Amino acid sequence: MAKTPQAHHESERRIKRAFKRKGWSEVKANDSWAIFKVMSEFVMGFEAMQRIRPCVSIFGSARTKPDHPAYKLAEEIAFQLTGNGYGVITGGGPGIMEAANKGAQRGGGTSVGLNIDLPFEQQPNPYIDKEKSLDFDYFFVRKVMFIKYSQGFVVLPGGFGTLDELFEALTLIQTQKIGRFPIILVGKKYWQGLLDWIRVVMGEENSNIDVNDLDLFSVVDKPEEAVAVINKFYSKYMLKPNF
């Protein structure tokens, strides 16, 4: 649904206020104090996340509407994950994130939301367990929580933010900064163009990745396939934080 002109102008004003240009003197004065804010977010996140049961993170577009097939797919994946003993972690917002939290609650499982404060005022969706809705100012702190406490990543169609989370995990596993865990792309048709480019342009034509790097993730279409990949992995390995 298109924004009204009034809503569009208000959105622009919020963004401009959020990104108001700062002089170097103000930046230098604030940088040292920002360390304490970063530390407090890590402490808050670690203390909250270490108390949850094993969880799988589900990623995808915040723009996906409830009547979209991907929304239904995310909800069903989360529902089936809870039936297999996993909780669900999302970015806490609307769209795919909302669908996944909804599916987790429908299944009676743990439903965690790691919300990020944005100029666009993203609000946590209503399907997050009350004591498990966490707010972050810093994307990089939030990423650490996803990486450390997820037993798997399930990645549905999304945009730049979804790709950011996907490639962060792939990079850390590829460089052996963390151990391997299941990464599952859902929607073969959606991901095929990107995967062809990675395989052909990055791999075959330029040798910028190893052919074995393509084995770091799985591609599926159905909820039960995604859950099966995770269950198969943890039939061999122990459930634990990734670092």
Question: Where do the protein language model's features map onto the residues?
Answer:
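Glycine-rich beta-alpha loop segments
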Residues: A2-Q6, S11-E12, K22-L114, Q123
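Short gly/pro/ser/thr-enriched loop/turn and capping motifs at secondary-structure boundaries
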Residues: D117-Q122, T162, Y190-G193
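Structural motif
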Residues: C55-S57, G87, G109-G113, E131-S133, ...
